[in-house]
Swiss-Prot record:
Protein name: UvrABC system protein C
Keyword set includes Cytoplasm: yes
Predominant location category: cytoplasm
Example of a GO biological process term: nucleotide-excision repair
Amino acid sequence: MASAHIEHKLSLLPDLPGSYQMKDINGKIIYVGKAKNLKNRVRSYFKSSHDGKVAAMVSQVADFDFIVTSTDKEAFLLEITLIQKYQPYYNIKLKKGTGYPYIKITHERDPKIEITGTIRKDGGYYFGPYPNVYAAQETMHFIQKVYPLRRCNGYQGRPCLYYHMGQCLGACFRTVPEKEYTDQIERIKRFLNGNVGKAKASLTAKMERAAKNLQFERAAEIRDQLHYIEQTLEKQKIISHDNTTRDLFNFYMDKGWISIQVFFIRQARLMKRESRLFPVVNTAKEEFESFILQFYSRRNNVKPREVLVPAGLDNKVLADILEIPVRTPQRGEKRDLMALAAKNSQIKLEDKFRLMELDNRTTIGAMKELMAALNLPMGHVAEAFDHSHIQGADPVSAMVQFVDGQPAKNNYRKYKLDADKTHNGADEAANTREVIRRRYTRLLKERAPLPDLILMDGGEIEMNAAKDVLENELNLDIPVAGMVKNNKHKTAALLFGNADQLINLDPKSQGFYLLERIQDEVHRFAITFHRQLHAKNSLASRLEGIKGVGPKTRLKLLRKFKTINKIKEAPLEDIQELGISKKVAQALKLSLTAEPTPARRV
């Protein structure tokens, strides 16, 4: 039986072609498939009976994801690419021995064209993968006839049979000029990249002549060659024929949330996709541009040769900061890929909204399961806390409240921490003690109801700090549990009890799903508040209101000084070296020296 989480996601699947990825409890992809209709195909795994390896695979599925494509064939090729990248356990088990061909031009003094199942870094040209082995072979044979290279085994002192048939340039008996090979390879590359107009026109004319001369078998053979070429070289939105490494970004915004898709194009294929969903604090344009810039500050994200973005962004500023070209596709395959990323962004966000609506209708019993897992009597109210800061700067905490499994948003609270006065903002224990002290001291003073359970995002440091304040300062007996995440930053388990016992919940249970929602919600709420506060103190924000400091000047200041304090401490001469007048430089330092209005404590 499918978990509530999977049941909800099944109800949101679109009636569109695409590739789906089954994941285990750790978020690892264990199976990749394709579908003409994602809704029907994915639902069949959980709504029909299976046996053998398929049943074993389904029993391991804790979640799934999908990527929408424009055609069935794109779904097929995307499936191939993802299988080759992730090597999912059950694809290997279910499809052992299955390979997908590439057409290759070898990197040799006398190159040849061949079919291969493996890409190697050997200097050769690779085209594919192709979904139809027979069609790829027929196309290769056609190329050998029309654009011959070497078809023999090399020099043997006399012309080979293929040379007499016009299918070999003659490496068998002569030294073929390198330019002759280079020109021929360029023709083949154009042909395999889809520029087949001349070849098809020539074949069509030959087919018509053969039919006119009553050579019907020859005409049928040429007709089949045309069919194979069209089938093999059909242009794909997913498989780019340009080997430039690219990252493609697009987004969709609605109801205060932004959904971002990142397509990683490597070796002429979509190698990976990342999705992000988060609430919008500024405009969609500002959030999107900020996301792109922060994306490449992450340790594992290597910059590509080119970044593609939708229209409406400041491409020049992005390119200057990233130091790589940032372009907006205007036509052709890249524009189609951009539209596909936008479509996936929209589907992802609309799915989230529908899932949230379903969540609110299916939380009965979830709180009971959660309390039972902790061996506690039935409770109704849970309050969860999370902290947010950037290396200790602008530290904040946030609290969300859930009543009978439903978010009680009127009771959410934000806390601007006094870290600068009392402790380091990166001290999680001190942050926890402060927010717990403030929250429950106030409830005691107001004689307000206390929660049945407190959840701390983090681990034993946060949990024990909260228990210390409650028990030793406020004399309160409220159960406290720590919400633990795995290495993929996903909800994994609870810490609870005097011995900090790790409690693993059934990931398919309503209780686990409620815990996951609470953890995601408090994290979202804390991050949103921190962004709002940090924006007030950020360099870019402070610079925007200063007369004479326009976008270009802001960019220069950002790149040279990085922080407000460095500008404050810089001599006027250093600022003027950027082409800024003395009057503007003085106004800049005066404005930045003035303290911003303090935020009201909640």
